[in-house]
Amino acid sequence: MASTSDIRNGLCIKFNHDIYKIIEFLHVKPGKGPAFVRTKLRSLSNGKVLDNTFSAGHKIDEVRVETHTYQYLYAEGDQFHFMNIESFEQITLDKKILDNPGLLKEGTNVMVQVNTETDLPLSVDMPASIILEVTYAEPGVKGNTATNATKSATVETGASINVPLFINEGDKIKIDTASGSYMERVK
């Protein structure tokens, strides 16, 4: 059992008969009254986000997890296939456990958190950014660009991303995997 002082981003806890991953937390010490911790939890079974407040000193049930590096192989419907790069063991994960599956490119390394008690995968952490090639980009209309004008572009994985007007087919772009947004053009 851990206490609220042990809370950190990425910690997996058992709460309300489900396993949650802490996305955000904030220790609050008001002028009057006891301290507390505001948390944002994501359910690892269904992906829903829950806001919860723990009082200071509250005991939480920490879930022991191991992190392994897996390589993305291919997708088959809603099933995504990965291979452990150390043991070459293959696993199949459901689409709902992934944050942004449309950005996964074959050969991409991801970090898979596995519950040590049940050996079940809990979550998949993609790299912070990924470089993909633009396969289709709408033509950019010059003029009327007083603001940050964007257009829709399709990348090699089939995902649609909003990009600046100067991006053309064949360009490689860097994409933030957490938000799925354009970061920069790569030379």
From Swiss-Prot:
The alphabetized list of GO BP terms reads: peptide biosynthetic process
Its recorded name reads Elongation factor P
Where, subcellularly, is it found? Cytoplasm
Q: Which GO terms describe its molecular function?
A: translation elongation factor activity
Family per record: Belongs to the elongation factor P family.
* GO CC annotations on file: cytoplasm
Identify the InterPro entries for this entry: Elong-fact-P_C, NA-bd_OB-fold, Rib_uL2_dom2, Transl_elong_fac_P/YeiP, Transl_elong_KOW-like, Transl_elong_P/YeiP_cen, Transl_elong_P/YeiP_CS, Transl_elongation_fac_P
- Chief localisation class: cytoplasm
**Highest lineage ranks of the organism?**
Bacteria, Pseudomonadati, Bacteroidota, Flavobacteriia, Flavobacteriales
Q: Which cysteines are joined by disulfide bonds?
A: none
| Entry keyword annotation includes Cytoplasm | yes
Query: Which NCBIfam families does its entry note?
Result: efp, PRK00529.1
Q: Does the keyword Protein biosynthesis apply?
A: yes
Originating species: Flavobacterium psychrophilum (strain ATCC 49511 / DSM 21280 / CIP 103535 / JIP02/86)
Which function does this protein serve?
Involved in peptide bond synthesis. Stimulates efficient translation and peptide-bond synthesis on native or reconstituted 70S ribosomes in vitro. Probably functions indirectly by altering the affinity of the ribosome for aminoacyl-tRNA, thus increasing their reactivity as acceptors for peptidyl transferase.
Q: Identify the pathway.
A: Protein biosynthesis; polypeptide chain elongation
Q: Pfam families this protein is in?
A: EFP, EFP_N, Elong-fact-P_C
The UniProt keywords, alphabetically, are: Cytoplasm, Elongation factor, Protein biosynthesis
- SUPFAM superfamilies referenced in this protein's UniProt entry, alphabetically: Nucleic acid-binding proteins (SSF50249), Translation proteins SH3-like domain (SSF50104)
